[in-house]
Amino acid sequence: MKKPFNVIAIIGKPRDQQAIQTHRDLYHWLSSLGYQVFIDDRLSAILNDVPEEHFSGLVELGEKADLAIVVGGDGNMLGAARILSRFNTRVIGVNRGNLGFLTDLNPEDFQHSLKAVLDGAYIEEERFLLEAEIHRHGQVKSHNAALNEAVLHPGQVAHMIEFEVYIDESFAFSLRADGLIVSTPTGSTAYSLSGGGPILSPSLNAISLVPMFPHTLSSRPLVVDGNRRIKLLVSPDNRGTQEVSCDGQVSLPVSPGDEIHIYQSPNRLRLIHPKDYSYYHVLRNKLGWSSKLF
């Protein structure tokens, strides 16, 4: 019987000793099962019991592997997702972080659940990403992708920003606020949630726009079709510099008068879960929702 996966990548960053031990345990366990295993080269100086030829950079791991196991919290998953979404690589997470909305496996007993996944017992879903582009004088000055959200916000000094929002070139509204969160369904349980945005089911083809501390009593979050293109026109009268943050990890400088174009990326994150995965169980567990009464 053909195995669903043959080449497996282990991805993560050097953190505490427990997380490093999880990387080591995964490598030796998967190798003992006969898989070809490669590890994120950011761990090469620490995992000195792993042969040098088994380390690769993230792009090379995406090219080689048909399964990537991300060890850490959602932050590690976000960083890996922006790269792995370019490739035909399925991704699963071992939670060594805090909430872990995207990382399902328990690091203390991952073997049982992961073995079932390796045998083909898993749920697969595609999560879309956003592309964010900064346009200045008709040229794209910078761009990046975001799995959770792209956020327009002030630079180093906190102050209000004035901007206009267009959806498919149609004017929607203007705003004076601390910024705007443009979120995917995946990101709806992250920064967007903290800003009062709605929780969107991951399978929805939708994008939410969540104003940050708007200087008005009438502003509300807005959910639009996921195929819409969003343009933010930053007022030339703004003081100082602004930024667009992608997943809180990559910053794109914005100047007064710039245009910010945000749209759905053609790339997809192929996220997989154990067979018993339930999104609503995750919400109850992570957000402390009440259990069933009867």
Swiss-Prot record:
Catalyzed reactions: NAD(+) + ATP = ADP + NADP(+) + H(+)
Protein name, entry field: NAD kinase
GO biological process: NAD metabolic process; NADP biosynthetic process
Ligand binding (NAD(+)): 74-75, 148-149, 159, 176, 178, 189-194, 249
A Pfam family hit: NAD_kinase
GO-annotated molecular function: ATP binding; metal ion binding; NAD binding; NAD+ kinase activity
Entries under InterPro entries matching the protein: ATP-NAD_kinase_N, ATP-NAD_kinase_PpnK-typ_C, NAD/diacylglycerol_kinase_sf, NADK
Superkingdom of the organism of origin: Bacteria
Sorted UniProt keywords: ATP-binding, Cytoplasm, Kinase, NAD, NADP, Nucleotide-binding, Transferase
EC number from the UniProt entry: 2.7.1.23
Compartments reported by the entry: Cytoplasm
PANTHER family: NAD KINASE
Protein's UniProt keywords contain NADP: yes
Purpose: Involved in the regulation of the intracellular balance of NAD and NADP, and is a key enzyme in the biosynthesis of NADP. Catalyzes specifically the phosphorylation on 2'-hydroxyl of the adenosine moiety of NAD to yield NADP.
Species this chain originates from: Vibrio vulnificus (strain YJ016)
CC annotations in GO: cytoplasm
Gene designation per UniProt: nadK
Coiled coil location: none
UniProt record similarity statement: Belongs to the NAD kinase family.
Enzyme class (EC, first level): transferase
HAMAP family per UniProt: NAD_kinase
Cofactor(s) demanded: a divalent metal cation
Active-site residues (renumbered): 74
